[in-house]
Amino acid sequence: MQAEGAGTMHELSITQSILEISLKAAAEQHATRIRAIRLKLGAFSGVVPECVQMYLDVLAKGTIAEGAKIEAVTVPLRVECRACGTVSEIDRRHIACPACGSVDLHRLSGREFLVDSLEVDV
């Protein structure tokens, strides 16, 4: 059962992975503290940055990532129309080619989810 306003188990497991990746990368650079974790999230990734931050605040306690902030950049949904070849950015409200109206689209970006960079103390 999920409390109102709480994150989902989806974000919990994602946050665990983010923390593991970040701690490993920071250790390789001999970092003493992680100040920020920068993410690239596709508009259709399904990841809610506020939920990731909430879980990170709990999971990172006692690690060099304690107090780290999540900074997320959203990658727009880019598609190529199979009917006319137009490449464009679309959103959830208008899932059709803006040039010809076709819904036969090939996704080029928009589901990304990656740790892009860290801000650390060394």
Label every PLM stretch briefly.
Residues 2-4, 8-23, 46-49, 65-71, ...:
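Extended interfacial segments that mediate partner engagement and assembly in macromolecular machines
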Residues 79, 95, 113:
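Cys/His-enriched microdomains
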Residues 61, 94-97:
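Short, solvent-exposed secondary-structure boundary motifs
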